[in-house]
Amino acid sequence: MTETINTAAQFPSFEKPTVQFNEKGWGPCELPDTFKDVPYQPFSKNDRLGKICDWTNTSNNDKKYQNKYASSFGTGNQYSYYHEEDETTFHLVDTARVQKPPHQRGRFRNMRNSRSGRGRNARGGLNTHGMTTLSGKNVKARDPRHGRGMGKKFGHRGPPPKMRESSVAVRADWASIEEMDFPRLIKLSLPNIKEGVDIVTCGTLEYYDKTYDRINVKNEKPLQKIDRIVHTVTTTDDPVIRRLSKTVGNVFATDAILATIMCSTRSNYSWDIVIEKVGDKIFMDKRDHTEFDLLTVNESSVEPPTDDDSSCNSPRNLAIEATFINHNFSQQVLKTGDQEPKFKFEESNPFISEDEDIQVASVGYRYKKWELGSDIVLVARCEHDGVLQTPSGEAQFMTIKALNEWDSKLANGVEWRQKLDTQRGAVLANELRNNACKLAKWTVQAVLAGSDQLKLGYVSRINPRDHSRHVILGTQQFKPHEFATQINLSMDNAWGILRCIIDLVMKQKDGKYLIMKDPNKPIIRLYDIPDNTFDSDDSDDGEGDDEGFQQVYNYAHNKI
């Protein structure tokens, strides 16, 4: 008997599904109820769908790349992740604080380091020279305060920076020819400039007193007020340059004017130089009755002096004080007297006549020339302040300058009476930071003159509140070329800046021009000015042109 096998019961049946036909596009015409209201976005398996949370460190790097977790397959952003700050718990808090004077800022810094276990020479602590040391290459990356654009002025509630005034008021009839920014000037270079050749030597020098080399903090010496005439004659008023301009050279200047131009990239204060072009000759002059010959104080400091003019610590009064100290120090350290030997050059002082019976400062003048290429011959008057006789009997010429301490607490400086004998390098490094332009100009003047030594004196106030009495705390000497290397002063760059300005003026027509450093920007501008500008009979002279120096001390502009 054969049994009938029911194949339909043993195998599942296949039901034909209903397929919707979409005449207008791809995909089904209707969505099932289970997939309704569900967002859809095209995606790729390479997309990053999430991020590991880090609750221990808040970083600002994601703000720059907010779309790095977005889909790279489509244009939708349904599932994109954005790192946003939670502002639900944000409240305004008064963070204003009283502005402390400069000498009180950071007074507990060492105490905080000691409490946190960061002592001297420890990791991240202070070394023996008082400088903070940070180990590791990515220290700034681990500190959120060092983020880009963060931490520099965070929480700053101080007054806005004071705008400096221009050295001369720019008039409406002045035409601006060229603007030279410092980044461009720093890249200039004019190598292989040989040493200047002497043309004429004038004046009389006194010998240096070596007893001043033994002065220290414990054996200080008062600074004397010496009544001597110091001539600061500009280029066109120099009778020797007038004589030489007929036969030698086509660019004429003084060492002070050249040093100002060569070190212009280190200057912050405004200054100006008048240039007159006559045919193929250029004469660089300073204006009369200006502050060009005053020595700046803390010009390159982080917090330069900004007191009112009535204060003895105002920028102008400090400059007059520094000039007063520098002139007196350069004469006090010399052996004076009728019986003392003197070094005489070929010609006498060109700024005094034979019948004049006056006390003239010890200054030797060298009129030198340099070949700058392209038929440009520079003639300049350089100066020596003294002469030193070596044991072999050879005469070494000196450039003598003085650094002055006015108030170390207000100047954020180093206390000289505590550090000068034991850490003189730290004192000099601090002065290089605060007076970079002034020291660079002194070095350039010594190099141009061919001085064998650059003698620096350290002069301080007896009382920080008394700006009329000073003491000498020590001296230090350098070779000008070696000191230029120490302060990162490139003479090739200095010659390049000077040559750039000479070339610009040579391209102009005959007339009068003015170079001015912008008081608030690192820019030098060249102006074309009328020929009668700054003349003595010009009643509409610039602001402050007819104003002499303030009589803070009992000496005139050219008298110590």
Swiss-Prot record:
What does the subunit section of this Swiss-Prot or TrEMBL entry state?
Component of the eukaryotic translation initiation factor 3 (eIF-3) complex. The eIF-3 complex interacts with pix.
Name of the protein in its database record:
Eukaryotic translation initiation factor 3 subunit D-1
Q: Which family does it belong to?
A: Belongs to the eIF-3 subunit D family.
Amino acid composition bias (Basic residues), ranges on this chain: 100-121, 147-156
Q: Set out the biological process GO terms recorded for this chain's protein.
A: cap-dependent translational initiation; formation of cytoplasmic translation initiation complex; regulation of translational initiation
| Annotated spans, Disordered | 98-166
Q: What does this protein do?
A: mRNA cap-binding component of the eukaryotic translation initiation factor 3 (eIF-3) complex, which is involved in protein synthesis of a specialized repertoire of mRNAs and, together with other initiation factors, stimulates binding of mRNA and methionyl-tRNAi to the 40S ribosome. The eIF-3 complex specifically targets and initiates translation of a subset of mRNAs involved in cell proliferation. In the eIF-3 complex, eif3d specifically recognizes and binds the 7-methylguanosine cap of a subset of mRNAs.
- Phosphothreonine modified-residue sites: 128
In terms of InterPro entries, this protein maps to: eIF3d
What's a Pfam family this protein contains?
eIF-3_zeta
PANTHER family, per the entry: EUKARYOTIC TRANSLATION INITIATION FACTOR 3 SUBUNIT 7, EUKARYOTIC TRANSLATION INITIATION FACTOR 3 SUBUNIT D
Query: Do the record's keywords include Cytoplasm?
Result: yes
Q: Does the keyword Protein biosynthesis apply?
A: yes
In its UniProt record, a GO molecular function of this protein is:
mRNA cap binding
Q: Taxonomic lineage per UniProt? A: Eukaryota, Metazoa, Ecdysozoa, Arthropoda, Hexapoda
Q: Where is this region: RNA gate?
A: 291-305
Q: Which UniProt keywords apply?
A: Cytoplasm, Initiation factor, Phosphoprotein, Protein biosynthesis, RNA-binding
- Chief location of this protein? cytoplasm
Q: Where in the cell is it found?
A: Cytoplasm
